[in-house]
């Protein structure tokens, strides 16, 4: 039996993940992360490319360990500002048929009931 490879994209609902200043494609649109069309276009591109899914990461705070300050994270836009990944999944799912979705979530900072309600509504 042959094994199939799965292709999954990794993204974050912010301007940059943890690689600011690295080479980027001239057609990169990540600065449009606040526009819903950016996310629906991305979902359609991934589906046309036969990706199995997309994982949208999240972080629940600002990195403030380096030099005991958040200054470098803020000036470098390192995962900040970041938006809730759960808000874009329904729109992305509405424009695709086969793309799977995964998101970072946490019940450490919120009550389990509203968390379960939100996830079950997706």
What positions do the PLM features span?
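Short His-Asn-centered micro-motif
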Residues: 57, 103-105
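Short, surface-exposed connector motifs at secondary-structure boundaries
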Residues: 96-102
């Amino acid at each position: 039996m042959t094994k199939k490879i799965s292709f999954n994209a990794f993204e974050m609902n912010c301007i940059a993940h943890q690689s600011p200043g690295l080479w980027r494609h001239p057609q990169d649109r990540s600065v449009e992360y606040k526009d819903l069309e950016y996310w629906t276009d991305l979902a359609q591109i991934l589906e046309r490319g036969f990706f199995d899914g997309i994982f949208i990461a999240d972080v629940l705070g600002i990195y403030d360990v380096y030099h005991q300050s958040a200054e470098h994270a803020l000036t470098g836009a390192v995962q900040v500002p970041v938006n809730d990944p759960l808000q874009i999944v329904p729109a992305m799912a509405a424009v695709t048929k086969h793309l799977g979705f995964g998101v970072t979530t946490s019940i450490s900072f919120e009550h389990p009931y509203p968390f379960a309600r939100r996830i079950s509504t997706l």
